[in-house]
């Protein structure tokens, strides 16, 4: 009698059918799905598509994106609108699932609740937890050679990096910490001493000194004021009246022969 292992006609058992295979949606579930379709379009797809389309248009207009030779920014805008439509539909799936799970006597809502409670991939592992698990794996975990430790640099242990700097002689001339430089304030204070403050002078002292300087200025022969020359009055020239030579008549008239 042949064993079933040696029988070549043995076939693996068929897979279990999907729970939603040949599922008949109820009227309430169909109504909820239609509401989800409408709400996802107006609340998610339309804003996302409009935003991505405007970004594509202004990107081509400002030169950030390369437009089509014939159609310009139209292809980029259409692609942005289509991408925003699908992103909006995908982002509304969780809210639509919550609406279906709130329906009473819904087999689809019961399946969604069991999947959430039973540990689906999306519901059981959050992004933060998944990221933490990824960094704890072997390729990301630090090895002993990568971990920094200052034990090798401690003075108690003799290693090749322990440099005996304290026993070496130091030359004070080579130490430029206290060497004066152009930026040093001590050099400026040593070479440029401040002038002593002059005693204050009163108004009487200034007045007396001004008088002395004025008197010295007046006594100097080169500083005498300019004196205009005295105008000489000229006497009027008297015309000498020459008496005509000759005899006079009885009336005083003179004549010559």
From Swiss-Prot:
Function recorded in the entry: Maintains stem cell potency. Involved in endocytic pathways that mediate signaling during hematopoiesis.
OCIA domain residues: 1-110
Domain of life, per lineage: Eukaryota
One Pfam family matching this protein: OCIA
Compositional bias of kind Polar residues: 156-170
Name by which UniProt lists this protein: OCIA domain-containing protein 1
Chief subcellular location: other
Subunit note: Interacts with STAT3 and ARF1.
Keyword Glycoprotein: no
GO biological process, one term: lymph gland crystal cell differentiation
Expression sites by tissue: Expressed in all cells of the primary lymph gland lobe.
Compositionally biased tracts (Basic and acidic residues): 204-216
Region annotation Disordered: where it falls in the sequence: 1-20, 148-257
Coiled-coil intervals: none
Family: Belongs to the OCIAD1 family.
Species whose genome carries this gene: Drosophila melanogaster (Fruit fly)
Other facts noted in the record for this chain: Marker for all hemocyte lineages during development. 'Asrij' stands for 'blood' in Sanskrit as this protein is strongly expressed in blood vessels.
Annotated InterPro entries: OCAD1/2 (IPR040187), OCIA_dom (IPR009764)
Keywords, ordered alphabetically: Endosome
GO cellular component terms, semicolon-separated: early endosome; endosome; Golgi apparatus; lysosome; membrane; mitochondrion; recycling endosome
Cell compartments where the protein resides: Endosome
């Amino acid at each position: 009698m042949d064993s079933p292992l040696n029988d070549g006609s043995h076939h693996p058992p068929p897979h279990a059918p999907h729970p939603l295979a040949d599922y008949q949606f109820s009227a309430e579930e169909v109504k909820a799905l239609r509401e989800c379709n409408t709400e996802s379009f107006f609340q998610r797809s339309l804003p996302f598509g409009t935003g991505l389309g405007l970004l594509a248009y202004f990107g081509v207009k400002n030169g950030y994106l390369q437009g089509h030779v014939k159609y310009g920014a139209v292809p980029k805008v259409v692609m942005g609108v289509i991408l925003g439509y699908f992103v909006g539909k995908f982002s509304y799936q969780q809210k639509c699932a919550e609406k279906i799970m709130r329906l009473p006597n819904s087999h689809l809502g019961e399946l969604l609740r069991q999947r959430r409670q039973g540990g689906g991939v999306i519901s059981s592992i959050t992004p933060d937890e998944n990221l933490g698990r990824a960094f704890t794996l072997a390729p990301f975990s630090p090895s002993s050679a990568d971990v920094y430790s200052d034990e090798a640099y401690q003075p108690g242990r003799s290693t090749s990096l322990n440099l005996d700097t304290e026993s070496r002689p130091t030359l004070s001339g080579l130490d430029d910490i206290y060497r004066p430089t152009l930026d040093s304030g001590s050099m400026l204070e040593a070479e440029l001493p401040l002038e002593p403050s002059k005693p204050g002078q009163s108004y009487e002292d200034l007045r007396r000194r001004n008088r002395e300087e004025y008197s010295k200025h007046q006594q100097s022969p080169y500083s005498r004021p300019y004196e205009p020359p005295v105008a000489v009055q000229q006497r009027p020239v008297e015309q000498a009246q020459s008496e005509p030579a000759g005899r006079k008549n009885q009336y005083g008239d003179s004549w010559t022969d």
